């Protein structure tokens, strides 16, 4: 015999008993339209609906939502904040939510939004301007400096120049004149955040007649806001069938509701237990304890935090990073991992378990995680200045002060020292590179992206790897060739050394001035020794002795760290001492003898993507 599941049986009884009840009281919903939508300082009636106003009370496309006392409205698949509503003139001021944080993003993540002309008219006090990214720059267009992009061009006309590869349109006051505010992005951002005003195309006379006849205004179609009058009150008498259905439904309502609630709670608990069990099957016991202590978010909460994943700030090999805001107003970065069906989420487990055991000024702070089936996300603090690789390019690094570069290198060293020697469980990162070093407002570095990390007891000095991991150019020789010894925390030391040489510009010089050298030079810059003998410190010619001392110290530390043999490299606590100590105490490290197998075959199966996860302005 076939048995209905308990949930189906309960629902069947529920809908059977209440079949006549909606028919008996459907007209009563019309009385609910007297109520107003309330959210923060926004009060709205017809043609809006939402909250305690059912859909019948408004236009299908004008549903208002309230979250944290902020009213929002979806127009043409774009979310807008409703800043104000003027019922006298049927106008409202709206602002696109994806413009509220910043319009200086690379690449442009924005798409043009079209307002339905049957419903909205933009007030004549506003106009549309188009923002472009043009290569080469068009001289006739006003340009504004953006930290993450370089420059943005603005035009009043909507013609698309051929050389402009990215564009989107914003609505701003007609008083805005691009040429008069040249190079001042602040005024443009302010005008965009203040939103723009639109008028609803409502037949005001018809609605006034409804009010005078003690009726309320309704709509007749889906797109045009054609109105008609509807009664506010119910008929006073119900049929006997309706009365019986109503009494029966009301009598059994508490029992059915209680049954449904108990069933849902049991089902949800079973589902959660199964999901947690699936996760725990692949996590060692020490890591489970670390996960339990973290705040766990539901996937719906993650969607609210990221405003339905509105703003992308970074992309990498393991997922996409979105900008988000917690309920207390804190800005966060939310990394949503890619489909994990094939690897049981080991990258997710590595990152969460590793970051959950850290607390250091130079390690990015983990705030929580989400794990619902194959939907997994990591929430951590947001770094306004993005990743280090954007600051050590040939153009930007030449303008940075040597003390700033030294502070960044020292901060990363302290962070790695903490991972190797300061944690209860030693953490080896395995993917130290500029893209995985984030910078806060004060250019203080924080190590991030622990997707390839491994945890081991501090007494263990050797790690066993089933696969080679890291990014080409930063991988220690022993990781892909056991000729050089065993893999250990010294592998991070090598990656740090290459990072330091990147900071002082050594990698750029290698690619431009040493193209005729052997392929092994991409792992060990042989030419640096020659420059040290000549007195050149590898980045630029400095005039002050203090800067010259900093440059030489960073160069020597970098060379010690990238020694091919792990035993010849200093541990990270010794690296910090070298960075903080006197230059005179540092010796020039011996020139290494590289083995032929130092350059591996570039197999994508073990190379992490270069575009790792990072946040941007």
From Swiss-Prot:
The modification Phosphotyrosine is found at residue 380. Residues 27-243 are extracellular. Its EC number is 2.7.11.1. Residues 307-594 form the Protein kinase domain. Its main location: membrane. It is an enzyme of class 2 (transferase). It comes from Arabidopsis thaliana (Mouse-ear cress). The active site is at residue 431. The modification Phosphothreonine is found at residues 468, 471. ATP binds at residues 313-321, 335. It catalyses: L-seryl-[protein] + ATP = O-phospho-L-seryl-[protein] + ADP + H(+); L-threonyl-[protein] + ATP = O-phospho-L-threonyl-[protein] + ADP + H(+). This is LEAF RUST 10 DISEASE-RESISTANCE LOCUS RECEPTOR-LIKE PROTEIN KINASE-like 2.4. It is found in: Membrane. Keywords: ATP-binding, Glycoprotein, Kinase, Membrane, Nucleotide-binding, Phosphoprotein, Receptor, Serine/threonine-protein kinase, Signal, Transferase, Transmembrane, Transmembrane helix. The chain crosses the membrane at residues 244-264. GO terms for cellular component: membrane. GO terms for molecular function: ATP binding; polysaccharide binding; protein serine kinase activity; protein serine/threonine kinase activity. Glycans are attached at residues 41, 69, 86, 112, 184. SUPFAM superfamilies: Protein kinase-like (PK-like) (SSF56112). Residues 265-617 are cytoplasmic. Belongs to the protein kinase superfamily. Ser/Thr protein kinase family. Residues 1-26 form the signal peptide. It is a single-pass type I membrane protein.
